[in-house]
């Protein structure tokens, strides 16, 4: 299991709270970037390929958000939809989408991903 922030080219894609600073659409993009970063780690550990991925077991998507914001599942869909596009049925997974007051480095999204390998 890995905890992933939305880094691209060494920088966070977006920082701040959803939706006052970061739009839902940008937060979805950040969730997708977290997944891509996680899959890069998996591929690096598996000889540069994802062929050993049996299935995606679980995602935990944490959203730094304003009080009263209740659309965390919509943000998490950015990550879930990407995994299903990549892996098909094996990309279906259990998921938690949780709102929080703050995340490390002021990230707007953080993803925890559990992958089962062959």
Which residues does each PLM region occupy?
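Short, polar/acidic, helix-capping and beta-turn segments at strand->helix junctions
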Residues: 1-118
């Amino acid at each position: 299991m890995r905890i992933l922030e939305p880094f691209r080219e060494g920088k966070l894609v977006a920082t701040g709270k959803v939706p006052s600073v970061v739009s839902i659409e940008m937060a979805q993009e950040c969730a997708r970037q977290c997944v891509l970063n996680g899959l890069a780690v998996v591929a690096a550990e598996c000889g540069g390929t994802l062929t050993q991925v049996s299935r995606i077991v679980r995602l935990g998507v944490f959203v730094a958000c304003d009080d009263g914001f209740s659309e965390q599942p919509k943000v998490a869909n950015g990550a879930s939809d990407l995994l299903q596009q990549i892996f098909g049925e094996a990309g279906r997974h259990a998921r938690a989408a949780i709102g929080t007051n703050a995340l490390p480095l002021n990230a707007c999204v953080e993803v925890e991903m559990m992958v089962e390998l062959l």
